[in-house]
Amino acid sequence: MICGIDEVGRGCIFGPVLSAAVIFKTKPNFLNELDDSKKLTKTKREYLSSLILENAYYAFADISNEIIDKINIHNASLLAMQIAYQKLNIECNLVLVDGKFIPKIQAKQIRAIIKGDSMIDEIKAASIIAKVQRDKLMVEYDKIYPLYGLKKNKGYPTKEHKDAIKKHGILSLHRKSFRLI
């Protein structure tokens, strides 16, 4: 069994960093449609996410902005990956993570693959479901904090988001260790 792990929300200034771990139950027929979540349209991501969730074992983990501020985004991303894998509770022959760094995971083999979210099906799948999950969370936060445009900016430091911070102030879910304005 191969497990792919990726995270989303590293560059955001609002909310958690979120990771997903994915193991396909069998080889699905839609693998050729997978790609890095950033390269797919919202509609395509949501469609593929539903297929992935039906055809894979998966787990999510998020690390709050407070913890990000305490341990930094790099360590928080690795921790999210570690927890997502642990939540799967399935032993894998090979764990593949997107990026340069390996989280603290007990596995027979583990490898970090730069641009893995564009090359490895399991990492692509993790990228997609993590992005869809975090985007849904931002839509929910937008209902609570409509002045910050979270539905549109997804917590990233857009001009509109930074202008909203200048005008309305920093929220408890903003990452204080990041340059907010």
UniProtKB/Swiss-Prot annotation:
This is Ribonuclease HII. The lineage of its organism: Bacteria, Pseudomonadati, Spirochaetota, Spirochaetia, Spirochaetales. Manganese or magnesium. Binds 1 divalent metal ion per monomer in the absence of substrate. May bind a second metal ion after substrate binding. It comes from Borrelia recurrentis (strain A1). Endonuclease that specifically degrades the RNA of RNA-DNA hybrids. GO terms for molecular function: manganese ion binding; RNA binding; RNA-DNA hybrid ribonuclease activity. It catalyses: Endonucleolytic cleavage to 5'-phosphomonoester. It is found in: Cytoplasm. Its EC number is 3.1.26.4. GO terms for biological process: DNA replication, removal of RNA primer; mismatch repair. CDD domains: RNase_HII_bacteria_HII_like.
